[in-house]
C-alpha cells in the first residue's frame, strides 16, 4: 500500500506550504498554506495544480495595487541601472501619459486602457512608440510577478493601433551651412566657448553629451598629435547638469584624434579656462541646460546671419549638434577605402551598421544609375 505523502496536523487536516511564485521583501520565496480535509492525495493535487500554474504564469496573487503605483515601482526597481536620459523618458511616459489610469487597479487593466493611452497622444507618433514600449514592459513584468496571467497579458497587449512613425532622416551639413560655419569660425563673431564647442563637434564628431562632459584632462598629447579621451556623458536632469561616468554604450569609450587646426585652438582655449571643465556657466562648474540652450541659440543666430538670413526670414533654423556628428561620419565615409568602416565606427563610438547606413547614403548621392546600367548591359 502506497504511503501518504502528507500527514495530518493536530486538527486532523492535511497541510503543507507551497511557493506561489512571488518573493518576500527580504528576497525569500513566499509560500502559501494549503489544507485538505479529504486526503493526502487531494492536497497533493492542489500542490501540483499551483506549481503548474506558477510554472506557466497562470497563477495570480490577489493584489489591490493600482496600475500607476506598480508602474512607478517598476521604474524605480527595474530601470535603476539605466542611463538618466532613459529613466527620464520612462518617468515622462508614466507621469504624463499613463497618469489618467491612477484609479485603475493593475488587475483591472484591459486592452481598452492601453489603446486609450495611445489615442491620447495620437498626434505624437514617437511618443506613442514610447508609450507602447513602456506599457508593454510593465504588463510583462506584472506577469513575472504573478499579478496577472500570461493569457491576460496577451489580451491586454494585442492589436494595439499605433500612428505611423516616419523616422526623421539624418543629414550632414548642407552647402549653405558649411559656408556659414567657415565664415563664423574665421571672422571672430563666436565667443571662445561657442568656437570651442563647434570645433569639437565638427572636427571630432562627438555627441552633445560627450562634448559637454569634457575636462581639460581629456585633451591629451600622444606621439606627434592630440586626441580627446571620451569616457563620460553629461546629461540634464531638468535644468541641472549631471555627469555620468559611462558613455551611451561600451563602444562610446574611445580616443578620438584631434586634427591640427582644432588642436591648436583647443590648446589656446584650455589655457584660458578658470577651472577644469571645458564648458561651464557662471553659476555652475558644469553647464546647465538653460545655459546650453542659450549658447546653441546664439550659435544658430550667428550662422544664420552669416548665411544671409534674419530672425524673420531665417536661412538656417533647423540645425542641431547631431547634424555635425553625422557630417563628421559622412566626410569619413567619402574617404573609404583609405579608412575602413570598422575604424570609422571606432572613432564614432558606434556600430558598424550605423556607419554602413551612412556610407550607403553617401554612395546613393554619387551614383549615376543611368550610366552604370548602360555600361553594365552594353552587349
Segments predicted by a language model, with ranges:
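N-terminal DNA-binding module of tyrosine recombinases/phage integrases
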Residues: 9-13, 22-112
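Conserved tyrosine-mediated DNA breakage-rejoining catalytic core shared by Y-recombinases
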Residues: 16, 214-268
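C-terminal catalytic core of Y-nucleophile DNA break-rejoin enzymes
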Residues: 32, 38-39, 244-267, 276-298, ...
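N-terminal core-binding DNA-recognition domain of tyrosine site-specific recombinases/integrases
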Residues: 39, 75-147, 167-169, 189-190, ...
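Basic, Lys/Arg- and aromatic-enriched nucleic-acid-binding interface segment
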Residues: 129, 144, 148-150, 154-212, ...
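Catalytic-site neighborhood detector that most strongly recognizes the C-terminal catalytic loop/helix
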Residues: 164, 172, 348-372
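Short, basic (Lys/Arg/His-rich) helix/loop patches that form interaction surfaces
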Residues: 183-191, 256, 271-277, 284-285, ...
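Short, polar N-cap/turn motifs at the start of nucleic acid-interacting alpha helices
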Residues: 219-227, 338-358
Amino acid at each position: 500500500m502506497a504511503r501518504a505523502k502528507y500527514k495530518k496536523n493536530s486538527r486532523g487536516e492535511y497541510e503543507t506550504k507551497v511557493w506561489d511564485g512571488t518573493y518576500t521583501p527580504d528576497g525569500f520565496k513566499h509560500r502559501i498554506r494549503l489544507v485538505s480535509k479529504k486526503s493526502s492525495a487531494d492536497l497533493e493535487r492542489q500542490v501540483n495544480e499551483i506549481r503548474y500554474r506558477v510554472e506557466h504564469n497562470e497563477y495570480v496573487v490577489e493584489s489591490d495595487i493600482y496600475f500607476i503605483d506598480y508602474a512607478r515601482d517598476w521604474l524605480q526597481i527595474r530601470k535603476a541601472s539605466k542611463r538618466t536620459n532613459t529613466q527620464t523618458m520612462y518617468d515622462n511616459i508614466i507621469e504624463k501619459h499613463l497618469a489618467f489610469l491612477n484609479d485603475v487597479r493593475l488587475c483591472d487593466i484591459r486592452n481598452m486602457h492601453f489603446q486609450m493611452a495611445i489615442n491620447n497622444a495620437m498626434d505624437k507618433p514617437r511618443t506613442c512608440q514610447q508609450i507602447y514600449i513602456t506599457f508593454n514592459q510593465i504588463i510583462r513584468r506584472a506577469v513575472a510577478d504573478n499579478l496577472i496571467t500570461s493569457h491576460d497579458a496577451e489580451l491586454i497587449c494585442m492589436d494595439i493601433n499605433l500612428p505611423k512613425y516616419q523616422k526623421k532622416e539624418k543629414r550632414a551639413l548642407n552647402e549653405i551651412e558649411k559656408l556659414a560655419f567657415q565664415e563664423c569660425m574665421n571672422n571672430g563673431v563666436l565667443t571662445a566657448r561657442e568656437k570651442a564647442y563647434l570645433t569639437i563637434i565638427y572636427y571630432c564628431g562627438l555627441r552633445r553629451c560627450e562634448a559637454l562632459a569634457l575636462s581639460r584632462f581629456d585633451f591629451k598629447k600622444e606621439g606627434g598629435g592630440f586626441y580627446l579621451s571620451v569616457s563620460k556623458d553629461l546629461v540634464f536632469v531638468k535644468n541641472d547638469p549631471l555627469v555620468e561616468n559611462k558613455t551611451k554604450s561600451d563602444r562610446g569609450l574611445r580616443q578620438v584624434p584631434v586634427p591640427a587646426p582644432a588642436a591648436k585652438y583647443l590648446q589656446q582655449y584650455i589655457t584660458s579656462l578658470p577651472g577644469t571643465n571645458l564648458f561651464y556657466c557662471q553659476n555652475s562648474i558644469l553647464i546647465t541646460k538653460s545655459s546650453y540652450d542659450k549658447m546653441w541659440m546664439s550659435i544658430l543666430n550667428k550662422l544664420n546671419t552669416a548665411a544671409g538670413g534674419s530672425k524673420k526670414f531665417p536661412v538656417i533654423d533647423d540645425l542641431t549638434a547631431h547634424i555635425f556628428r553625422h557630417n563628421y561620419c559622412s566626410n569619413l565615409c567619402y574617404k573609404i577605402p583609405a579608412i575602413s568602416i570598422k575604424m570609422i565606427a571606432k572613432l564614432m563610438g558606434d556600430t558598424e551598421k550605423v556607419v554602413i547606413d551612412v556610407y550607403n547614403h553617401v554612395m546613393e548621392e554619387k551614383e549615376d544609375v543611368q550610366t552604370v546600367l548602360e555600361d553594365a548591359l552594353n552587349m
